[in-house]
Amino acid sequence: MHSPKRNYDIMQISVPEAIQQMDPEETLFSHPVDTEPYNALGIGPGLGSNETTAIALIAQIRRSTCPLVIDADAINILSSHRAWMQQLPKDIILTPHPKELDRLAGTTSSCCYERLMKASELAERLQAYILLKGHYSALCLPNGHIDFNSTGNSGMATAGSGDVLTGIITALLARGY
């Protein structure tokens, strides 16, 4: 786990088994990490959105050599730096909730179908996987197909659970799924 220096003690106490890599900055993500030793990388939850972090994020995305999952603050940074979206690697996974998708697409959708079509178009244009979170989460594939998860419940689409979902997807990618 890469985290600002200030988080070291709390991380040691709450998740002692986590391997930590501390950012040189006290309170923000400022430098990309070497991803060579990793099988997957999840970026976004708790990241923050200041300009130093935004620059470090795009540098991290460019330098990453492993599969990436982008969520939360990382999605918001990409939404405010739209030109950077063209630099995303093929097959990246983006996990927006509906409002984050609206920001990514640069439009506002009032209906679910319209939003779903925007997610599908964006996935095709970026050659990315977009998991649009909701009661029935939709996975928009780079080839234009859309798969729905109609099993389970909307627990992972509930406010505050996106960080957990990012971790689960990242862990599955790291295991080779």
Language-model-derived ranges and their functions:
Residues 103, 155-177:
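Short, small-residue alpha-helix embedded
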